[in-house]
C-alpha cells in the first residue's frame, strides 16, 4: 500500500484589487480554475453544433484536420449574405439554403467522428475565458520539485482574467522537516510558470523556473542558511519546452527492485495489459539482485565524469539549444546556443535529455507531430570555452511499426481465444455470439484509438539505449518501453539490408542494432453504451474488467534512483509500475486517499489565531497564504486545540474538525461548480504534477487545490518474513549508499524504514540495515572511506536516533562524530597556529594568531570533559559488574567473524536490567581508540605551547590530559593483547608474530607524542590495523570487569559536582526532541516499556517517552496505514547551550543572529569575522552534515525570517521541551536559573500566543514538571551515593 506521510494545503487570500475588478469575477478558489488537458474527454459529449467547435481540453494550438472547419463555414455564410444584400427574397432563400448546408455539413462531421482515425482539435474560449486556468498540460509541466537538501518548491498559476491583467506568480518553498512553515517568493513571472527544477550540484542549490513566454530565472538565497530568496539571473529564452540541470556526477544505474522478487502480478483494475509476450518479460525482469550494482560497487568499477561547472540545458519548441553555465573567470552566468535541424514550420512537442558518460556530451530525443509518429535521437557535443555546439543525428525510431505489430499480435491472440471459447462452450452458442460481438466492438474501438495516438511524454531510463514513451489517444493511452538491442538477421533479409544500407553485416555475426519494443501497456475506455449496459454485471462479477471513463494516463514520472515509474491517472488515482515490464506494483485510488494524514497542531483559539495571523509578516505587501483565513468569521479557521487524523478512521477526529472540514469542502465545491460548469466534466481534485525525493523513496504530489501530499513506496507489501527483511535491509542500505555518493539528504529513507518497522516482526530492520551498510562501507578503499566517513557516521546516528530503546547507541554515534570532528580540526590547525606563527614588523606575535590559539583551547575543553566521562563510565561498568555474571552478549554465529564496529555490540545484551553505560562500545573499535589517543596528544601539545588566561577556559593546564593518557594507554595495551592473542591462536600463527604486533602497538603508544612535539608529523608511526570481531566479545567483557584494578577510584571523586547527566549537556550528547521523526520513532521490540522508561530517564529524554508510548498504543499490530504525528516546536532555547563549532557557551536569549542545524537541531552563532578553521563549517553542520537555517534572535523567534510563514500557528512549546532537557543539570541549578526564563517565556507567550486561561494551565504543568524532575534528581543522587 502506498502510505501517506504528511499533507499541507495553502489557501489563497483575496487581495484588495480583486474587488475592484468587477462583479463578474468570482472568488479565485484553487478548485475553480483547473481543467483537464490530458485528451481523455469524450469528444461527442463536448461537441457544440452552434459554434462548430469541439470544446475539448486538448491543446488549443492543434487545429482541426477536417475538410471544412468552423472558420470556413462562417466565411461561407458571411460571403453569401453579403453578395445578396439587395434582394430580400433571395436573402431569405440563400440564408435558408446556407443553414441547411451548414446543418448537413455538421451532421456529416458528427458521422465522421466515429470513423476518422486521426483528429486533433481546438478549443472554444468564448464561454469560459474569464475563469480559465492559464496553465499548461500535465505532461509538459513540472510545477513541483524536490531538492537534494529536502526543500520542496511548488507553484500554481492562477490568473483572475488572463486577457485583462497578468498577475505576478508566486513560488512556495517548504522543508519536509518543518511542514508547518513555508517561504513565498514573489517572482517576476507574469505568465504561467511551466517548470521548477532544483540543481543537483550541492551544496549551493539553485532553483530554476521558466514560464510559457520568454523568461527563465535562477533563484538563490542570500546566504547558505537564510530564507531570503532573490533572482540571481534572468535569461531571455523564448518558447522553452524543457530545462534540466546536469548532475554534478554522472547518473548511477538504479538499484535492484525489491518488489519484483516476489513475482506478484497486481494488475490495475481499471486497465488492461495487452503485453502477453512472456519471453520478453522473463528476459527483462530482474529476478535476482545480481544483475544490478550497488552504488559502492559502481563507484569502484565504473568511470564517472564530474562536471566542474554548474550547467543546465534548455531546449525550445523551435529546436534551439541553450547551454547555461557559470563563468568562473567572468563571475557571471553565460550561455551558448545550438540548433537542432528542423524543417520549416516544424516545432518540437516532446523532448528529453540524458547526460552520457563522456564529458560535455548528452543525448536528446525529440518528437514533433509535424514529422509523424516517430522519435529522433540526437547526440550533442558542446564546448563552453569555444562556444561550439555540435548536433549529430543518431537514431530514428518509428512508432507506427510498433503499433501495427501490436495490433497484429492482439488480433492473433483474440482469434486464438475465440477458437478456444468455441471449443469449450459449444453448448452455449447464444452466449458465445453475444461475447463475440462485444469483443469485436471493443477490438474495433481499440484499433481506432490506437491509430489516433500521439506521443505525449518521453523519458530516458537511465541509459542511452532505453526509453519510456507515453502515447495518448482520444480516450486511450499507452506506455511503451523501447530498447536498442542486437537483433539477428535471417538469410532472406540479408539482401534487403544490403540494398538499403549499402553494406552487408558480417557473416560470422549477422546482427544489427535496432530499437525494439520490450514492454507495452494499453489504457483505454470502452464505448459508453457498452459500459453503461454492462456496468452492473461487471461490478458484481469481476471489477477487473470494468473500464470507466477516467482510467487513462494523465502523466508519467520516472524516478531514476529507484527505477520506478509513477503513473497519474485521469481519475485522480496514482499507480506505481515496474520500469521493465510495466507490471503494477501498487495503486492508490482517489477514493482511498486520506483526507488529511496530518494536520499541524494549532494550540490556539480562534481569536488569538486570527490576531497572530494578522500580525504575521508578508513579502512585498502580498497576502500571506496561510491555512486559516484572514477574515474573522471565515469557515476556514480551525478552532480545535490539537488534531491528528487517522487515515484508516476519518471519523476519529473531533466534531469541530469534521464540521470545519465539511464547511471548507462545501464552500470549495460551490465555488468550483460556479466557475467550472462551463468546461469541466466533473468537479474533482486532479493531480497536476509529481516529483520524487532525492533518493526516490517518496513522491510529492501537487493537487489542483494547492495541496502537497507526500506518498511513499509500498514497502510494507514486500512482506515480513526473514527473507523479505533481508531484501528490505539490503535495499535500504543501498539507498543510503546512494545518498552518501550524491550528497543527498536521507530523510526519505528514514521514513521508509519507519513505515516498514511498524510490524512487530520487522522492528529489528534498522539493525540489519546498519550491518549491511557498514559491511559494504568497510569494503571500500581507504581513500573513499576517509572521504565518506563523516556522512557514514551521521547516517548511523540518524538511524539510532529514531529507534526507541537505542539512545545509548545514538550517544555513542554522536560522540564518535565529535571525536573525529575535533581531531580533524586540531590536525588542520596544528601547522598554521603552532609551527608557523605570524609575527608583526616589531617582532611581536600577531594578536589574531593568539586569539585563534585561545579559541582552539576551548575545543580542547570538550576533549578533556570527554576523557573524564570515558574513564568514569569504564570504572562504573567494572564497579557494577565486577562480582556479577549477568552481563552477557550472545552474538549470532553468522556474525562472529564480522567486526563489532559495524554495529552496536550491546544490542545483543541479555541482562535483566537495561544497559545504560554509554561510550563503553568504543572499547570494541580499536581504530577509534587510536583516534582518541591522537586527539589527546595533540590537545596536550596545544596546551603546552599556548598560554591563556581566559576565564571561559575551564582547564588551564594539561595535568588532566596526562592523567587520562596514563590509564588510557594501559587499557589499550590490555585489550590489544587479548584480541591479538585470541586471533593468532585461532589462526595458528607463530608467537613471534604476536610479539611483533604487540611491539608495534607499544612503540606507537610510547613514541607518538615525541614525534609530534618534534614537528615530525610525517614520521608519526601509523598504528596497526586490529579488528575486534564478534568472537572476541566475551573476552573483552571479562577484561572490562577488571577495569577497577586499572583505573583509580579518584575518577569518581567529584561525582557530586559533575554527574553523568551534566556531562550529557556539556558534551552535547542529548538526543534532540523537535524533529519530525523524533515525534514518530520506531518502537524497538527488544526492550520492554519499563526498560525504555528507565533508559530515557537516565539520558534525560522524558518528553520522548510520551511519544514512544503513544506510538506503542497506535502502532502495535502493524496493519493498516501508518499514522504520522507532528507538532511544531519553537526555535527558542533555554539554559546553557554550546556553540557546535567553537564550543563557546551561548547565553540564553541572545540578540545575535544564530544558525540551527535542520537535522540535529544544534546551534552556532553567526560570527561577523569567522575563524579560518571554522569557515569550512559555514555550509553544513560538522556533526551530522545538515544544512543551517538562520534565525535572527530568540526574541523574534515567532518568525524565523521575513519570508517564512506558519501554515499552522506555531505553538511556542520550547518551555515544555526544555523542562525535560534541563534535567541534565542538578536540581539547585535548575531551580535557580530557570525561574526567570519561565517568567520571561510566559510573558512572551501572553504577548503572542496565549490567553489567561492557557497561562494557568501552563503554570500548573510547570509545577508538576519541577516536582517530577526534583524526584528524578534525588533518586539519581541516592544511587550515586550508594555506589560510592
Curated annotation (Swiss-Prot):
Bias class Low complexity marks the residues at 76-104, 651-662, 669-678
Q: Does the keyword Mitochondrion apply?
A: no
Primary location: nucleus
The protein's matches in InterPro entries, at most eight in alphabetical order, are given as: MED16_bridge (IPR048616), Mediator_Med16 (IPR048338), Quinoprotein_ADH-like_sf (IPR011047), WD40/YVTN_repeat-like_dom_sf (IPR015943)
The record's SUPFAM superfamilies line, in alphabetical order, gives: Putative isomerase YbhE (SSF101908), Quinoprotein alcohol dehydrogenase-like (SSF50998)
Q: Does the keyword Transcription regulation apply?
A: yes
Q: Where is the composition biased (Polar residues)?
A: 614-636
Protein family (similarity comment): Belongs to the Mediator complex subunit 16 family.
Protein name (database record):
Putative mediator of RNA polymerase II transcription subunit 16
- Top-level taxonomy: Eukaryota, Amoebozoa, Evosea, Eumycetozoa, Dictyostelia
Gene name in the database record: med16
